[in-house]
Amino acid sequence: MTSDAELIKILSDASSGLLYQTELDYPFEVLILENTDKTAINKENILKLLKGLPVDYIEDYDFDFLFSTPTLEQYWHSENDKKRVVRYRNLVSLIKKNLKDIKVFRKGKIYIDVYITGRAPSGNIAVVSTKQMQT
């Protein structure tokens, strides 16, 4: 079984140097929410665990749609762009391989916190987070 520390390293290494590109580009962060093995993965619990306010706008979001653009190779991509696509595909694969019950939540409307959540092998909730900006 992969430990929480090993999982953080695996996902951190895979996302290191990648920026989620919207109107502003943001890196990824990986964390484990300790003692959450009996906590349901839902909007309310994630908001509470990540110190959001009950009035914060939060929505469910589709995991595959979130990564549909960064994992799509285009004919006009440079060699560096193609390498980045491969890295994104690897990150998506590692998330799917290592986490169960994957759910994505977006908090906010313009400056958006994105939480990719799932159940780590330990049972705790793992979070891969980034930010988006949409005007």
Where are these regions (language model features)?
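N-terminal "domain-start" segment
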Residues: M1-R84, R89-V92
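Amphipathic alpha-helical binding modules
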Residues: L94-T135
